[in-house]
Amino acid sequence: MNTIKTLLLSSLSIFTIVTANAQSFKEPVAFKLKNGMNIIVSENDRSPKAYASFTLDAKDFEGKKDGIVELLNAVLNENVAKNSNLSFKDNSGKLAVATASLDEELSGMAALIQHASINQQNFNTAKAKLLTSLKAKDYDYDQSVNEESISALSLSDVKAFYAQVSPEKTYLTIAGDVELNNAKASAKKAFGNWSTYSHQESSILTK
């Protein structure tokens, strides 16, 4: 449970919804979907919105190339429509929406993660933007994310890493103005049909 709380609080700090009144948070509830995906739900009826964070389980990706997660996030961002409530940064996908829209928006997030378009154009654009940001030093990236590590990564590296991402290696945190049963249903609807096979097939199709 300590690991769950750490992950939850880390996610909440990204969304800047932690208030002075910590008592508004209920004890987080953790469970797994049938495909092995880890889900954490924390209700906070004082929050103005519903939030979701999609993260990778770091221990399942030991030995990965430096900067690969941040570059994959940058490529995924090229798949996100303008003015979207979804963004990929800080090694995670983040969603902030009105509670009534959570079900629909979470399904959209899942579809993008499972069937991202990873091609040369998106890769080149994402890599250029990330390198520009690193040169400008306009964001506090992890020390492994630097001009040298990003420059060394290829489209093949990103595709290979993306193909390794599967449900049992990921966490979905849902928090804020949500009701537990509704959050469970939304998570199952959005990610319940995700399988390693379908994800790898999608990666092959983007070649």
Question: What function would you assign to each model-found segment?
Answer:
Residues M1-S11:
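Bacterial N-terminal signal peptides that target proteins for export
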Residues N2, A81-Q200:
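Charge-rich, well-structured scaffold segments of protease-associated domains
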